[in-house]
């Protein structure tokens, strides 16, 4: 793998519903206390991050990495300045993971939207099927 420290998990499907990020993180940390976790979200999610359940506790548990989007959103100043929130310098994409999931569920082709290696991984591991 290109990123050996990244791991895909279906943990959110196995936890009771409704499930919130703070609950997923608490579960992961309790199961793997020796692992350092980070959270990666799209910039579009950072705009409303302060409305997430226990968002301050999320930031106590993990560093937050924010992937940029083509369309700049209005991010609250206190979040931009937070020491645990890291804005990534990466190619700006005009779609979100939710867009990819919707297309996959409809059986639409997404190969032009994501790297070939990512598509191969999704297919090999039956992710989103």
Where are the regions that the model predicts?
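Nucleotidyltransferase catalytic core that binds NTPs
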Residues: 1-129
